[in-house]
Amino acid sequence: MKKKIIILLSVVIILLMGIVVWFNIPLDLMDLDPNEVMEIVVFNGNSGNATHITDKEQIQHIVENLNGVELKRSKPSLGYMGYSFKVTIYLSDGNEAGDWNNFIINSDDTIRKDPFFYSVTKGNIDYSYI
């Protein structure tokens, strides 16, 4: 009986350590080739206006900026409403970019991609440009 409790506690501790490591591991925001991007749609949550960016120079600036950003999970985002900018990226084939698509930029150092808020740990988001 004692042996089962020790094994169970060991498994629980290992699982908790794994969750802590997973939660704290840094993530790249994206890794896209700017030449593969056809359009970036930025929806302003403050005004309700959407901006469709198709200019290649603007796309290159935004994608290269976001490619250089590294993030870390900071807290759960469930239950939070409202945002500054929602970013959707469309590729040359007309499909949305995978993984980090439809994310929300709340500030120059905070991104929301449910179910978490993410803090910038490397690089910076050119918030004023977006």
Ranges and model annotations:
Residues M1-K4:
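Positively charged n-region of N-terminal signal peptides that target proteins for export
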Residues I7-W22:
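Hydrophobic membrane-insertion alpha-helices, especially the h-region
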Residues G18-L78:
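N-terminal export/targeting and maturation segments
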Residues G45-G48, S92-E96, P115:
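Glycine-centered tight beta-turn/hairpin loop motif at sheet-sheet or coil-to-beta transitions
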Residues Q60-E64, I105-D114, I130:
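Short, surface-exposed linear segments at secondary-structure transitions and domain or protein termini
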Residues E70-D109:
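Short, structured surface segments that line ligand/substrate-binding pockets
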Residues D114-I130:
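C-terminal partner/receptor-binding element of secreted or periplasmic proteins
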